[in-house]
Swiss-Prot record:
It comes from Plasmodium falciparum (isolate 3D7). PANTHER family: ADENOSINE DEAMINASE. Keywords: Hydrolase, Metal-binding, Purine salvage, Zinc. This is Adenosine deaminase. Inhibited by coformycin and methylthiocoformycin (MT-coformycin). Changing residue 136 to L: Severe decrease in catalytic activity towards adenosine or 5'-methylthioadenosine. The record marks 176 as: Important for substrate specificity for S-methyl-5'-thioadenosine. Its EC number is 3.5.4.4, 3.5.4.31. GO terms for molecular function: 5'-methylthioadenosine deaminase activity; adenosine deaminase activity; metal ion binding. One of its GO terms (biological process) is purine ribonucleoside monophosphate biosynthetic process. It comes from the Eukaryota. Coiled coil: none annotated. Binds 1 zinc ion per subunit.
Amino acid sequence: MNCKNMDTSYEIINYLTKDELDIDLSCMDKKERYKIWKRLPKCELHCHLDVCFSVDFFLNVIRKYNIQPNMSDEEIIDYYLFSKPGKSLDEFVEKALRLTDIYIDYTVVEDLAKHAVFNKYKEGVVLMEFRYSPSFMSFKHNLDKDLIHEAIVKGLNEAVALLEYKIQVGLLCTGDGGLSHERMKEAAEFCIKHKKDFVGYDHAGHEVDLKPFKDIFDNIREEGISLSVHAGEDVSIPNLNSLYTAINLLHVKRIGHGIRVSESQELIDLVKEKDILLEVCPISNVLLNNVKSMDTHPIRMLYDAGVKVSVNSDDPGMFLTNITDNYEELYTHLNFTLADFMKMNLWAVQKSFVDPDIKNKIISKYF
């Protein structure tokens, strides 16, 4: 696959306005509701660009580069992707590492970035923050991290221009150093080196208490880079220390996932006091077995308690889902309304790390 051969046509989306939020969804079938979810002007803050692709894109790369010549399409999907509930985040990480097979050259990386922007526009996203991990994308085929970054920025910018700026895109750098101070520092230095292209910094991978790395996060923040780390996602961890560290020591503006805030009234009060938004990824939480079912997802309780939350797809390529699937699940299982969703998306725009002028224009146009 090559960018020059990619379908860059697009349709104009007739977005919902504030005056159209009383649409009766109850009389619609699923197909009709999906048309509404698409028309809802959305801001997505938590999506890993590394795994933001359609099945067709993924299989095209696998076949073009002859990566798994002895597997059928079904076997490839089962081997690499995570379309049904698993046992844990660890199981997901194991599969995600296999995915690095596809980051075989810089053309694939650029194509992936461009493809992701077009897909998000087609889902009705007006403001999109992608994040990616330089180390994750580079290690399997020993690609140069700076050239990976160059390819991603080029792909994103070209796609936004081809879409005539009907979608705005920001980029976060993700560090995933685990408990290695050296790897964490290396990721932070990469982010600072390319800070003109990044709007924020994130830590992902296995959830850990980041207290030992406070100095690294302080350095990033002092460079004017906003912070959002994964915390309060993994229910197998016996404490909530990652959340307290993120809030009280790292001074994050947002938290990736953060659903375990619901387990503590003190944490609920704390995120409200500090005006921290939780980047909630509903389908991801269920598939990774951090929430037993969508009916019991804590986003409903958090929203009702006055905590700012947003709706996100996390790893849509891995999950064979997209952002509109998450809205459908929240409507079907937790009775969220269009007005609720509009409020969440306004919060997301307000808490986005992109330039304030971009945010103000989007708020004025859609909210």
